[in-house]
Regions:
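Positively charged, low-complexity intrinsically disordered leader regions
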Residues: 3-77, 81
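Phosphate/diphosphate ligand-binding glycine-rich loop within oxidoreductases
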Residues: 51, 57-162, 287
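Adenosine-phosphate binding glycine-rich loop
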Residues: 276-277, 282-323
Length: 323
């Protein structure tokens, strides 16, 4: 039978999106405020099933395009292995592999990739670029990090907390370090959504953007921003930190290391937390700067569970957004 195309036909507006349906992006924690707990529970359930030998191939025939403007260990490996376990395929694209790195517009890149892949994962230099790609892509866009937020990491951390604590609501999370980075911002929103109280402990010049503080407070949780490290971990159920020098801040490394002196998570701070408190770090860790190795590899640390859960949490995200 001959196939006849009419003038009204379009080819692959977005191969993962049926015509008439709204696509869904994960750019901010606020994008999952209605179903965050459901996604976390899905990740825990899929992890359990996979480890018991059950198939989790829920995305057969699906392709994830991964754009990396920043280097990565965990983000790349976790997304690639996740797609393999789901029965799909992941395509790695560094900025040097595609024309985006040579001046092609984000708009054209988004429109073209939307014709080839079912979802785009973007690890971006800027939140502005992330928003622009999502604006023009006709398939879902999942953030692998930008300069303002890191939603996949905080979904991972909340999954890890639930595995170890059994709940979120009413717990106290203390984040020590760079309060103005993407992890801190996403913690504020994520804790708000699940009902955890949060204390950000950071030098004043590195406090979070007021937008994220105000959004977190709208959820009715206790939000404290302080530069006082003494007693900072009192009543903490979770203690978290991150590198003092994020990618893109290398030119400011010397000044940052001076500014953050005294904010190292050490045994004393962990002993001042609750006896069953856990320690989180998204890695890579720089020992004796943001955390001592004794803490990072100590009995309260769950950082390697956390690292593994990047894969399971992202599996849950992709099943939610791509299936």
């Amino acid at each position: 039978m001959d196939i006849v195309f009419t003038s009204g036909d379009t080819f692959k507006e977005g191969i993962g999106i049926s015509k008439g349906l709204m696509k869904r992006d994960l750019i901010s924690m606020l994008d999952v405020k209605e179903d965050l707990e459901e996604i976390i529970d899905r990740g825990i359930d899929i992890k359990r099933k996979a480890k018991s030998g059950m198939s989790i191939e829920q995305l057969k025939g699906k392709t994830l395009g991964m754009i990396f403007e920043k280097s990565s260990t965990r983000t790349r490996v976790s997304f690639e292995v996740a797609m393999e376990k789901l029965g799909g395929h992941a395509l790695f694209l560094s900025k040097n592999d595609i024309q985006l790195g040579r001046g092609e517009t984000i708009e054209d890149t988004a429109l073209v990739l939307s014709r080839y892949v079912d979802t785009i994962m973007y690890r971006a230099m800027s939140h502005k670029a992330m928003r622009e790609l999502a604006k023009y892509a006709t398939v879902p866009v999942i953030s692998g990090l930008d300069d303002k937020e890191h939603p996949c990491q905080v979904i991972t951390d909340l999954m890890t907390i639930k595995e170890h604590k059994g709940k979120h609501k009413g717990l106290n999370l203390v984040y020590i370090g760079d309060g103005g980075n993407n992890i801190s911002h996403s913690y504020l929103l994520g804790c708000g959504i699940v009902g955890m109280n949060i204390r950000i402990v950071s030098p004043r010049k590195y406090w979070p953007d007021s937008y994220y503080v105000n959004e977190a407070k709208k959820f009715g949780i206790n939000v404290e921003i302080t530069d006082k490290i003494e007693g900072a971990t009192k009543d903490a159920d979770v203690v978290a930190t991150d590198t003092w020098v994020s990618m893109g801040d290398e030119s400011k490394k010397e000044q940052r290391l001076k500014d953050f002196q005294g904010y190292t998570v050490n045994d004393k701070l962990m002993k001042n937390a609750k006896p069953d408190a856990i320690f989180l770090h998204c890695l890579p860790a720089y020992y004796n700067y943001e955390v001592t190795k004794d803490v990072a590899h100590g009995k309260q640390s769950v950082i390697f569970d956390e690292a593994e859960n990047r894969m399971w949490a992202q599996i849950a995200v992709m099943v939610t957004f791509m299936k």
